[in-house]
């Protein structure tokens, strides 16, 4: 999962 804010998503996009 990955939104505009990666830190909000866990786990975050590796790239």
From Swiss-Prot:
A cellular component annotation (GO) from this entry: extracellular region
Between which residues do disulfide bridges form?
1-13, 2-9, 6-12
- Residues that the record marks as modified (4-hydroxyproline) are 11
According to UniProt, the name of this protein is Conotoxin Fi3a
Subcellular localization, as worded in the UniProt entry: Secreted
High-level lineage: Eukaryota, Metazoa, Spiralia, Lophotrochozoa, Mollusca
UniProt entry keywords in alphabetical sequence? Disulfide bond, Hydroxylation, Neurotoxin, Secreted, Toxin
- What is the protein's known function? May act as a neurotoxin.
| Main subcellular location | secreted
């Amino acid at each position: 999962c990955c939104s505009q804010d990666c830190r909000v998503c866990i786990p975050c996009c590796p790239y």
